[in-house]
From Swiss-Prot:
It comes from Triticum aestivum. Mg(2+) 2 binds at F222, T227. Pathway: Nucleotide-sugar biosynthesis; GDP-alpha-D-mannose biosynthesis; alpha-D-mannose 1-phosphate from D-fructose 6-phosphate: step 2/2. The active site is at D15 (nucleophile), D17 (proton donor/acceptor). Homodimer. GO terms for biological process: GDP-mannose biosynthetic process; mannose metabolic process; protein N-linked glycosylation. Its cofactor is Mg(2+). Keywords: Cytoplasm, Isomerase, Magnesium, Metal-binding. This is Phosphomannomutase.
Length: 249
């Protein structure tokens, strides 16, 4: 019965961190079960800033078949029905010389940054973006939580973004603060709206995300004319909103 009611023209599209899972945590069995139920009614997709490996760590190894669409790196790597349907490369787009200039400057900036602790993996190069973390991505969860609180008071990431934006204005880059400890850097237009080019068949796209404010990594897709945007505060809130929108009968 449920499958027959499915509205193929409607897509529910979800951010990962803070929307389907707690930040950098694994999805709960309850959320997986709810998503399965939701898929009986509407088409379901996820779009995350992280690469597919990290999204799989959070949503499970079968993620590309658990959802109709999986967009990693904001959709620069796109899967539909478990199959790869598109990729885009930052290296090809910017070239090695400009990449090296950006990475060198960023590492020098972090080296001179006075913050309580630093760990490792300050820059992570992905196929479609660069992720920059002033504290370093391999800090512990406790250190992540502490840095997030420190950053809210001292604006470490916003200040760093401001410097980089001015220094590299000629590259037309977007800087998007997301998660607890880092920010993403990518060419303008390579934000989460990038995935919408694969979704033209849908008459209604509902997007759910927690960082929908200006500067947050859900902002552009939340504001897009192509989507109906919903701001969520937690995975539980996501479930409640979806129930009232899609499963209210």
């Amino acid at each position: 019965m449920a499958a027959a009611r499915k509205d193929a023209g409607v897509l529910a599209l979800f951010d990962v961190d803070g929307t389907l899972t707690a930040p950098r945590k694994e999805v709960t069995p309850e959320m997986l079960e709810f998503m399965k139920r939701l898929r009986e009614n509407v088409t379901v997709g996820v779009v995350g800033g992280s690469d597919l490996v990290k999204i799989s760590e959070q949503l499970g190894k079968s993620v590309i078949t658990d959802y109709d669409y999986v967009f990693s790196e904001n959709g620069l790597v796109a899967h539909k029905d478990g199959k790869l349907i598109g990729t885009q490369s930052l290296k090809t787009y910017l070239g090695d010389d400009q990449l090296k200039e950006f990475i060198n400057f960023t590492l020098h900036y972090i080296a001179d940054l006075d913050i309580p602790i630093k760990r490792g993996t300050f820059i992570e190069f992905r196929s479609g973006m660069i992720n920059v973390s002033p504290i370093g991505r391999n800090c512990s969860q406790e250190e992540r939580d502490d840095f997030e609180k420190y950053d809210k008071v001292h604006n470490v990431r916003p200040k760093m973004v401001s410097v980089l934006r001015e220094k590299f204005a000629h590259l037309n880059l977007t800087f998007s603060i997301g998660g607890q400890i880092s920010f993403d850097v990518f060419p303008q237009g390579w934000d989460k709206t990038y995935c919408l080019r694969y979704l033209e068949e849908f008459k209604e796209i509902h997007f759910f995300g927690d960082k929908t404010y200006k500067g947050g990594n859900d902002h552009e897709i939340f504001e897009s004319d192509r989507t109906v945007g919903h701001t969520v505060t937690s995975p539980n809130d996501t479930v409640q909103q979806c129930k009232s929108i899609f499963l209210s009968e």
